[in-house]
Amino acid sequence: MAATYTIKVSGAFSAAHRLPGHPGPCASMHGHNFEVMAELAAQTLVSGMVADFMDVRAALDACFARLDHACLNDVPELSPPTAEVIAAWIFGELRARLEDGRVRVAKVSVVESEGLAASYAETP
């Protein structure tokens, strides 16, 4: 059985959104301090690491630059702007920036509010 190493890097951004057609209060504009956790995996290490934490942080920060203090309804890729859709979008952005044949993005989780989170992962 092959061993897998993983690392996790987290960050946060603040944004507003609304969920049109939602039967509850989320149909109205409201905001969150979103927390994001990205998990990367590799079966081999380079210089003892899956990836440099700072490289992963920079890739996350590039995502946050597009989302922080924005209205997520104005970001076409985030339709509808649910935590699940945000997690999938960040996953794709990180995959494009960080995957190299050795390292893969394993999972991205987005915490919308305390105790409420969604994750996106793809089977390798």
Where are these regions (language model features)?
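Charge-rich, low-complexity N-terminal segments
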Residues: 1-124
